[in-house]
Amino acid sequence: MASLLGTSSSAAAAILASTPLSSRSCKPAVFSLFPSSGQSQGRKFYGGIRVPVKKGRSQFHVAISNVATEINLLKNRVRNLLEESQRPVYPFAAIVGQDEMKLCLLLNVIDPKIGGVMIMGDRGTGKSTTVRSLVDLLPEIKVISGDPFNSDPDDQEVMSAEVRDKLRSGQQLPISRTKINMVDLPLGATEDRVCGTIDIEKALTEGVKAFEPGLLAKANRGILYVDEVNLLDDHLVDVLLDSAASGWNTVEREGISISHPARFILIGSGNPEEGELRPQLLDRFGMHAQVGTVRDAELRVKIVEERARFDKNPKEFRESYKAEQEKLQNQIDSARNALSAVTIDHDLRVKISKVCAELNVDGLRGDIVTNRAARALAALKGRDKVTPEDIATVIPNCLRHRLRKDPLESIDSGVLVVEKFYEVFA
């Protein structure tokens, strides 16, 4: 029954065990037809359908118990219990300061093609809290019901092979709406858990490609968050970045190959004291946000007080920010819908590329990401055209981690980007 309700939690199992299908609190709906009264005999079938029939002239009696009604009521009770038992999430709108990090996250939600964000900063500065608070703001998307890869019914680029084959054969697939997933990748995850596994025995004996999807499949069209990404094994980081860049994950085992869409926003966070990522890996992240410790005493007091309020009564605290959260969510939805109409002038594109060239940025990722981030910011502000101010806001986050490190240079790389921007755009 737990699988029927779509949950395997112990709380759900406890409810089901304590609530029989014919309990008083959950009475079945009974529909009866009584052309005439009289004694009846009949049989009761599986599923709650009872058809008593009486012999005699013009006498007929049917009674149907709607078990689906009981199951729906139980599902609602389970859903409510699970929502109450989940760990409360700190509201995104309640995060004090850290504007650079919050802006990078919002721009990636608006345009996932920016390529994710790497957040580096001191310990205890709210990196993980801010990323996880983003889950409340994520918009809904259309998916194929029951598909483990969250296939997009309108875009074959993010469809699984099975879904594409069904569409080509003319099958009508059920479509539903669901919130964008946020998947946490633990540091101890194995490559099979991340990429998925192939059942070799079943493939050899039955000739069927039995694939068990991993975290990359679950994160398709969603967000994959890696806390302490600088401590993750290098080969796993390579797998994540390759999948994020190509949008596909390929699993090869014993001559059997399976590919599935894996287009996700990769968000990583870490403490620079624990080690830096390799430059070629840093370059794969679209944006880079630096988080520092708040030095203003008044702000520190406000952060402590807000956190104390949240710890005391999370539900009441979240309710106090409900209006701001909804406003921000509507702003994100509007920006996502308007993004395709936002334009950027050719001369601004030329100046962006000139900044990248004069800073000796390797490759063209810096140019591409800066253009996309500037368009996303313009959409967030409700405009259909990019301005130099938009570029000035995002270009340090798009280029600072792509500059070559000079051990003798004492100036922060973000400052170098800003100086070069004003030199070129002046």
From Swiss-Prot:
Redox regulation; active in reducing conditions, inactive in oxidizing conditions. Thioredoxins f and m mediate the reversible reductive activation of oxidized CHLI. CDD domains: AAA. Strongly expressed in young leaves and to a lesser extent in mature leaves. SUPFAM superfamilies: P-loop containing nucleoside triphosphate hydrolases. Residues 1-50 form a transit peptide. The keyword Plastid applies. One of its GO terms (molecular function) is magnesium chelatase activity. It catalyses: protoporphyrin IX + Mg(2+) + ATP + H2O = Mg-protoporphyrin IX + ADP + phosphate + 3 H(+). Pathway: Porphyrin-containing compound metabolism; chlorophyll biosynthesis. Transmembrane segments: none annotated. InterPro entries: AAA+_ATPase, CHLI-like, ChlI/MoxR_AAA_lid, Mg_chelatase_ATPase-isu, Mg_chelatse_chII-like_cat_dom, P-loop_NTPase. ATP binds at G121, D122, R123, G124, T125, G126, K127, S128. It is found in: Plastid, Chloroplast. Coiled coil: none annotated. GO terms for biological process: chlorophyll biosynthetic process; photosynthesis. This is Magnesium-chelatase subunit ChlI, chloroplastic. It comes from Nicotiana tabacum (Common tobacco).
